[in-house]
């Protein structure tokens, strides 16, 4: 990430510390293995065999369940120690948790369909692991923040993932979120990655080849929204062959226009039409976002369709002073 983050007043160097969560350098395998071996030692376990993989997704086939005779597996005992550590400390800041755990690690985790079991995030545990704590156990976790990607401790073996080759973000209020309009927002050395549009995880086609046909076949409304935003409404309307039925000034948003289009029959929806409007509130960059609403096919006038979306009649909507 090139932009700086808002510092947390409790930890003067939190911005520099959180940079580890977005580091794209190769893992420091020696440091990571030493720290993990020391954590195993705290559990009374010998150093594990280390298996390095090139992405979290590549870890899945390498993971094996703990032996049936193990009443308390290594990962469960480690989780108990982590819970005790975290009881004494809060996350570094709400922004740190939102940016690192929810906006980045959360989207990467959601992109892996298989169950991962207990695991830790290495560099992306930076949201709760403090720098320079002076606590010997926490310092081992801090070493992992500085040294590697995600990791999975198991009986006698530990699977560790390399860090990504790229992590692309954009500001989102006081935090950051994944976004890339040209390729994966997160990409790992084996080519596996995660595509994201303004913080929403999307299939690769949304970023790399959005088309009206793919948008119309997509069931997920958020994916459709992102794809249309990326393609652009003008291109979508042209590709989809939508016919403009009516247009009218938007009384709830002076200076803007409502447009009502006829929609062709679609598999997932009852007969409907598309109302194209402009958001009444201003985006962070000062622009107003165009958006589309699917409305019942019974409406022939955009004011009636817009009023329906607010639970109003067209006549009532026409008397609005300003909407948001």
Predicted feature residues:
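Short, glycine-biased loop/turn motifs at secondary-structure junctions and
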Residues: 1-324
């Amino acid at each position: 990430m090139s932009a700086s983050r808002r510092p947390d007043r409790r930890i003067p160097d939190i911005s520099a510390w959180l940079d580890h969560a977005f580091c794209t350098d190769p893992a420091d395998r020696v440091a990571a293995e030493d720290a993990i071996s020391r954590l195993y030692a705290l559990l009374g376990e010998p150093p594990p065999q280390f298996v390095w993989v090139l992405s979290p997704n590549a870890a899945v086939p390498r993971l094996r369940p703990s032996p049936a005779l193990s009443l308390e597996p290594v990962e469960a005992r480690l989780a108990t120690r982590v819970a005790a550590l975290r009881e004494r400390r809060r996350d570094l800041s709400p922004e740190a948790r939102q940016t690192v755990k929810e906006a980045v690690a959360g989207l990467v985790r959601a992109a892996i369909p298989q169950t991962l079991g207990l695991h830790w995030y290495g560099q992306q545990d930076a949201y709760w692991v403090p720098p320079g704590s002076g606590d010997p156990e926490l310092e081992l976790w801090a070493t992992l923040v500085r040294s590697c990607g995600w990791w999975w401790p198991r009986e006698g073996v530990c699977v560790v993932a390399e860090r990504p080759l790229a992590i692309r973000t954009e500001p989102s209020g006081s935090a950051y979120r994944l976004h890339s309009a040209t390729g994966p927002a997160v990409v790992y050395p084996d080519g596996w990655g995660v595509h994201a549009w303004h913080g929403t995880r999307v299939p690769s086609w949304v970023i790399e080849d959005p088309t009206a046909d793919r948008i119309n076949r997509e069931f997920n409304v958020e994916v459709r929204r992102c794809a249309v935003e990326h393609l652009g409404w003008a291109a979508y309307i042209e590709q989809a062959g939508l016919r403009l039925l009516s247009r009218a000034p938007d009384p709830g948003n002076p200076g803007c226009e409502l447009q009502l289009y006829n929609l062709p029959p679609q598999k997932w929806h009852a007969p409907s039409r598309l109302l194209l409007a402009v958001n009444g509130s201003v985006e962070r960059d000062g622009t107003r976002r165009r958006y589309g609403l699917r409305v019942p096919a019974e409406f022939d006038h955009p004011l009636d369709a817009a009023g329906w979306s607010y639970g109003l009649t067209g006549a009532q909507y026409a008397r609005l002073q300003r909407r948001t």
